[in-house]
Amino acid sequence: MSVDLVNNPPHYSAFGFESLELLEKVFNLMPLKNMIFYIGNALKYSIRSKFKGNEIQDLKKCEFYIKRCSKLISEDFKIFESKEIMCYLTKISEKDFKLFLLINDIIHFALNPSQRNYNAVVNHIKKYIRERI
């Protein structure tokens, strides 16, 4: 049986769900739609980081895209939570708790794009990368 690297690459379903499902749930709740591209890429690179073959490079790409959000931050949004998103995060936490914490911070920032949350996620990414070098 061959692996379909176009329609179902294994590094995007390594946590037991297709990562696009999580991204779509997050995008639907994001108050700043102009951050979707950056957040989507940050989540993509963080989710696949342990499974694609170059973890540090993927984590640095994640950091790059989060930093692109800095000019789009606003302080005028309410906190969002989603039971659907928590189901995906639970699956990630069961396999890799530290990566879950990072992805959770990225999603928290995506749904609540404040300077405080931006600073927290940037610091978390840097720390996560340092732990892996």
Task: Cite the ranges covered by each PLM segment.
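Intrinsically disordered, low-complexity regulatory regions
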Residues: M1-I133
